[in-house]
Amino acid sequence: MTDSVIRIKRYYYIHILDNNTNVTRTISGPVVYTRQEHETCLFDPRPCVSVPPRHYCVVKNPCVRNEAGEVVLESSGQVKLRLGDAEIRFEGEPFPLYPGEELDSKEEQSVRKLQVIPPNTGLHVRCVRDFKDAERLVVAGTEWMVAGPQSYIPRVEVAVVEEVKATVIYPNTALLLQANVNFTDRRGVLRVAGEKWLVRTLGAYLPSVEETVVSLIQGTMLSELKALRLSAVRSFTDVYGKARRAGEQWQVTLKDAPVHIVDAYETKVAEVAAVSLNAKEYVIIHHPVDATGHNRFGETLVRRGECTFFLQPEETMPRGVEQVLVVGKEEALLLEAVCEYHDGGGKHQPGSRWMVRGPCEYIPANEVKLLEHRRVMALDRNEGIYVMNTTTGEVRAVIGKPYMLDSNEVLWEKHLPLAIEELLESPNGSIKTCERNAGFVSRREKYRIVRFNVQHNAAVQIYDYRTKKPRIVLGPSLVMLAPHEEFTVLSLSGGTPKVPNSMQSLQLFLGPRFSSDTIVVETSDHARLRLRLSYNWYFDIDRANPSQRTFSVPDFIGDCCKTIASRVRGAVAAEDFDSFHRNSAKIIRIAVFGVDEVGEAKKNLRFNANDFVVTNIDVQSAEPTDEKTRDSLQKSVQLAIEITTKSQEAAARHGNELKNQEAKGHLERQKLIDKIEVENARTKWLELQAKSEAVQASGQSIAEAKARAEALLIEVQSEMQQAEMRAKAYRISAEAELQKLQQRQALELEYTQRQNEIDVAKARAAAEAEAEKVRRMVDAIGRDTLVAIARAGPEAQVKLLGSLGLKGYLITDGNSPVNLFDAAHGMIGEPKK
């Protein structure tokens, strides 16, 4: 400011710099200040700092004041400052800032409101430098809580760490606290750093600076069906006054408290639901707790309803709640004693087994182990199972009746080779080697008896390796294997040409059947031919007593084909190609079947080793194996066919020409006949034309008269025909009506006759019934009784009249008939019933 005269209002101030001494001083208004030449006004008049009520400000580098409150000046006249320090000033008279003093502006506010601490709130403060308060020395680092409600008076030596709100503790809740340092809490309990405890007092709780709120713990509501399982973190005494060891587990139930709040050194393991059992339920508890509260590990306890209980710690129910075993009439339980056991039936040693048969209810005991719940196995007439006696090791088959395993019996599984299993599941017990399934898995129940349906006209050989004897079953039949029996598997040749082991089969087809084979032969002139042969065969066996030699040749197809091929090759080798080609069937038949005494070919070929008979052989094809020979043969055949075809064409052409010549001769002759007929027809036409001209000359009147006469004749004939048709129709209608009337009358007559017969039969039956009724009544009442009843009325009336002294009287005329039957009734006045 350059003005020499400065007007300073009230509560305003300026700083004047003395340029000679370099000292700055403060001048407060109201005053008019005349600036000297060596003085400089540093700024325009500024308002003094005004702190309203409930406010404060922070002055940095405050000036030093003496005990009287006056500003202390240095020797140079400069205001003495506490550099680096700060001073908090509250409400009062406005004051100027001396040179060097500064207002601490926080959030652009130099004057701030005093902080109000509401209820249930506190300020966590920390001493940043030592100071003395109410004769008490507060050292740096000390922390404390300023609780509300109040206004917080700040100090430069104290810093606010945070605002802390109280935690409200509701019913069934508690506050978990942890000590930060060693201290004595509000209840006078000494706490060490890291210790945890619960505050259960209801209401708002404001923690001290030595405490940390860990969490607010909700209580667990307990009921008759709900308990709380706890575990001790360390050894302590719980809220119920019981000493707990570290790691110990226990349960709190409704008997202890309706609500439980997990303590600081307790851990909630789980909420345990009560186990409720009805009269038909039970549980097996493992590791039960004894009366002292300790688990008996390795033991079990059976509890049966009706009851409700909680599982104690370490107790388990691996199988859960189980229904009481209801053993039916056709059921049983296989039991085994795990230790010495006494029941109503006697004493059982450990390891002994016995059966409990139904009907009954059974609950396993601790000393007994339930091995199996057995039922009667219903078996049809063609079903069975294998049963093994565990005592003797004997295996037997049970077939066709319901069976219950005994205590020393088990189902025995009969294992068969995988190849036989696959054959059993094939439709006819046969399968080709190329069709086998490498991943085949048998679905047969091993303990079920092995069954196989032998087809019609087939046989199966079964070998008992215990008795070393085979047996043969002829079809149709159902084979059931005994425990020590096995199937005889046939491995047959197949394909064309035959390949060994191409097919496996459980049954031997007895035939008649046929087989085909391809063989290569060579004639005497070294012509190689491929023959395709087919032959019929069957097994000649005695069905009443089949022989075991039928199965003596495992591959009878292969042996038969080899034998036939050998004979055919030998026979063909003795013939040249032309001779064999002309007589192939005869040569092969004689070679295979042979000849009898008279030189004729036999009818069959018999293999005595297995009673195998070949009845017929057929050559399906014969062709050279050499390609050139085959082509030459085909060319010769084609040439022969062409020659035959050409000769047939020439004969047909000659016959056709002969027929054409004959047809031409017939045609010429017919033309001449037609000309003669035409001339005759022309002659007749000329004659008719002449007659026509004569008729025309006779005049038109004759023609018209003839036409009218013919028309009249036609009309009369038409009317006559119509009259005949009407008469015929009337006659047909009358006959139909008459026939209809006759049929109706016949039906009515038949109906009337049947109705009369029914009425007569009904009347006869009613009369017979009435007569029978009367007869039975008479028989029931008796003859003497009827006579007495008939006489009782008249006798009584006579006696009555006699007692009155009347002899009787009657007045009548000759025209009125007299009925004296009821005269007595009329006289005595008795009503007629």
UniProtKB/Swiss-Prot annotation:
The keyword Ribonucleoprotein applies. The keyword Chaperone does not apply. InterPro entries: Band_7/SPFH_dom_sf, MVP, MVP_rep_dom, MVP_rep_sf, MVP_shoulder, Vault_2, Vault_2_sf, Vault_3. GO terms for cellular component: cytoplasm; nucleus; ribonucleoprotein complex. Keywords: Cytoplasm, Nucleus, Phosphoprotein, Repeat, Ribonucleoprotein. Gene3D superfamilies: 2.30.30.560, 2.30.30.570, 2.30.30.620, 6.10.250.720, 6.20.380.10, Band 7 domain (3.30.479.30), Major Vault Protein repeat (2.30.30.550). Pfam families: MVP_shoulder, Vault, Vault_2, Vault_3, Vault_4. CDD domains: MVP_shoulder (cd08825). It is found in: Cytoplasm; Nucleus. MVP repeats lie at residues 10-52, 54-115, 119-170, 171-223, 224-278, 280-328, 329-380, 381-433. PANTHER family: MAJOR VAULT PROTEIN (PTHR14165:SF3). Required for normal vault structure. Vaults are multi-subunit structures that may act as scaffolds for proteins involved in signal transduction. Vaults may also play a role in nucleo-cytoplasmic transport. The vault ribonucleoprotein particle is a huge (400 A x 670 A) cage structure of 12.9 MDa. It consists of a dimer of half-vaults, with each half-vault comprising 39 identical major vault protein (MVP) chains, PARP4 and one or more vault RNAs (vRNAs). This is Major vault protein.
